[in-house]
Amino acid sequence: MNPQELKSILSSGLLSFPVTDFDAAGDFHQAGYVRRLEWLAPYGASALFAAGGTGEFFSLAPDEYSAVIKTAVDTCEKSVPILAGVGGPTRVAIQMAQEAERLGAKGLLLLPHYLTEASQEGVAAHVEQVCKAVKIGVVIYNRNVCRLNANLLEQLAERCPNLIGYKDGLGDIELMVSIRRRLGERLTYLGGLPTAEVYAAAYKALGVPVYSSAVFNFIPKTAMAFYKAIAADDQATVGKLIDDFFLPYLDIRNRRAGYAVSIVKAGAKIVGYDAGPVRAPLTDLLPEEYEALAKLIEAQGAQ
């Protein structure tokens, strides 16, 4: 799949990023991950991101990373395109990018470089080096220490033909508008704020109709119904789901840092697809939070 073909796929439909399965000892549980992917793939997501933020990319050892990407690619080969999360220091990100390409990933989601603060020019150099190390398509994730502006993104797009997408995890509307207007159809644009459904209508109005859904991990039918309601401007359905599910869900998610991942793993366990515990430094939901989430999920009905 060439970068432009991937760009076309990412320009419509719902995206998601499966949680990564760990066993009771905290090790990668391949069989559980295969079962999860086989369950989620038929629900109609346009693409899945393996080892993304919700997939606890930041906690995977190099050999585990390879195992996760290979498992996802092999399992979903005939059903849905797999993009691989890559990130961290430039040379580490390049190694991961080349490994993901070797294993058959259709594209990459370039997560932020690690801890170091850097100038716009430095971040742009980092992105360019990763893009030029592979032939597959790259989506850049503006989040945390990665905050590229429209000018530098435009320059990167000129120098890197395989830079095909921009995912926004900042929520800076002025920046999002400037990027969308400046780069036009050169990139595809993805909403990437945690629990993106809450922002989906606003982002669609900005020209960003596609987003990645975390709750697809445990209520895929509801997640697809919400996306279709957004696409159809069905404000009644959107409003009801936000009131009945997403706002109470956010109340649980916002209680502790890191719960954006923990709550998704809890949801997967509730619906019978236990992915095991989160890895430190994340912490799992407390029992009362788990029970509150279970009630919300039950109210959404069979998936």
From Swiss-Prot:
Top EC class, one word: lyase
HAMAP family for the chain: KDGDH
KW Lyase (keyword) present: yes
EC id: 4.2.1.41
NCBIfam families: KdgD (TIGR03249), PRK03620.1 (NF002958)
CDD domains: KDGDH (cd00951)
Source superkingdom: Bacteria
GO BP term, pick one: D-glucarate catabolic process
Keyword hit for Ligase: no
Annotated protein name in UniProt: Probable 5-dehydro-4-deoxyglucarate dehydratase
Catalytic activity: 5-dehydro-4-deoxy-D-glucarate + H(+) = 2,5-dioxopentanoate + CO2 + H2O
Keyword terms of this UniProt record: Lyase
Pathway(s) per entry: Carbohydrate acid metabolism; D-glucarate degradation; 2,5-dioxopentanoate from D-glucarate: step 2/2
One MF term in the entry's GO annotations: 5-dehydro-4-deoxyglucarate dehydratase activity
Family membership: Belongs to the DapA family.
